[in-house]
A protein has these predicted regions:
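Alpha-helix termination/capping residues and helix-transition junctions
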Residues: 11, 52, 151-154, 190-191, ...
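Short, hydrophobic/aliphatic alpha-helical segments
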Residues: 179-193
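A metal-dependent hydrolase metal-coordination microenvironment
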Residues: 20-149, 153-156, 162-183, 199-202, ...
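Alpha-helical transmembrane segments and their juxtamembrane interfaces
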Residues: 12-13, 41, 72, 211
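Sec-dependent signal peptide recognition
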Residues: 2-8
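Hydrophobic h-region of N-terminal signal peptides that target proteins for export
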Residues: 10-18
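C-terminal functional module detector
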Residues: 19-21, 190-195, 200-324
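Alpha-helix boundary recognition
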Residues: 51, 129, 188-189, 238
Length: 324
């Protein structure tokens, strides 16, 4: 048990980098478009929407270009809100999208399609890293583009969109096809480290609220940071110190050498259930209420937590790997 305890603590430190430094949770969106590409609102109003609705950070990720954020400070930035540059590297292999977000690039990005879908994705990832950015794989099930087979051989990437607001993203399993959560467990069960992101992929800020539109405010992440800065947010995302949500708010997520604990922030009279999930998507424990905990056995390979609410909202906590 002592050896297991040491291994879990080492993994927690390596993946989440916890320390005694005071931290807080900050809410943000990693995928949004403006009229600089195919969004229907100008960048300053995109920034203003997220600022006004209580977000602390936003990446504007227009297609194949970096939307300059410094000039938006007067309209976007506030004491508790920052804009971070981004770009959606928009590659295709044959008819299949291979889109990769570059979060906080330091320079313009150039990338080309490869000879396979996996190579094309890797080209986008490598281009993001060369620019000093954090790569994020976007909407794998959009047009049923790529899955765990294509993702398992990728290098230098940990973020992928588990939930994308767009109607065509096929987030859930149906018709014999795996949803994004099934892809996630398939990868984790191979011992591969991937962290789940929920994002708006916002394109539509104006007009009627019709089902086919990609409106803001439906998918987001909360990152644990010691300070609100681009570097701190990107570091938290890259090491998985965040949770993804479609509406559920968490008060805290804590992992010790003995347990994985989730504390939920209640909304109205909503009821909550937490699932602790392991290898091959196996449910290890189910617990109702605002506080849920799972005691490690030592043979799980990994443990992640999923919180779902009676109003249909969900939160996804990141996996912790356990090695004997």
């Amino acid at each position: 048990m002592k050896k297991l305890t040491v291994m879990i603590l080492m993994l927690i430190t390596a993946l989440w980098g916890w320390s005694a430094q005071q931290t807080r949770w900050v809410k943000g969106n990693t995928h949004a478009h403006s009229s600089n590409s195919d969004g229907n609102e100008v960048p300053r109003r995109v920034a203003r929407w997220y600022r006004d609705y209580g977000y602390q950070f936003l990446f504007i990720t227009d297609h194949d270009m970096i939307t300059e954020t410094d000039s938006l400070d007067a309209d976007g930035n506030a004491d508790d809100f920052i804009l971070i540059p981004g770009e959606e590297i928009t590659l295709y292999f044959q008819k299949y999208p291979a889109h990769v977000n570059a979060l906080n690039p330091g320079r313009p990005i150039e990338a080309k399609a490869g000879q396979t879908l996996t190579e094309t994705l890797q080209n986008g990832i490598d281009a993001a890293r060369r620019a000093g950015a954090i790569p994020q794989l976007n909407h794998p099930n959009w047009k049923w583009s790529f899955g765990s087979e294509e993702m398992k051989d990728l290098r230098s990437v940990h973020l992928f969109e588990l939930f994308n607001v767009n109607r065509d993203s096929n987030n859930f399993s149906a018709g014999g096809r795996p949803g994004a959560e099934e892809l996630w467990d398939a990868l984790l069960s191979k011992g591969l480290v991937f962290y789940a992101v929920a994002s708006d992929d916002t394109h539509d800020y104006l007009g009627d609220f019709t089902p086919g539109k990609a409106y803001p405010g439906k998918g987001w992440v909360c990152a644990r940071v010691a300070e609100l800065s681009a570097d701190a947010v990107c570091a938290a995302l890259d090491k998985g110190d965040f949770y993804a949500s479609t509406g559920v708010e968490l008060a805290d997520v804590q992992v010790t050498d003995r347990e994985y604990r989730v504390t939920i922030k209640p909304y109205s009279d909503t009821a909550y259930t937490t699932l602790f999930i392991g290898r091959d998507g196996t449910i290890l424990k189910k617990e109702d209420g605002l506080n849920a905990a799972y005691a490690f056995r030592g043979d799980e390979l990994y443990v992640r937590a999923k919180v779902f609410a009676s109003n249909g909202e969900t939160a996804f906590c990141q996996p912790v790997f356990i090695k004997k």
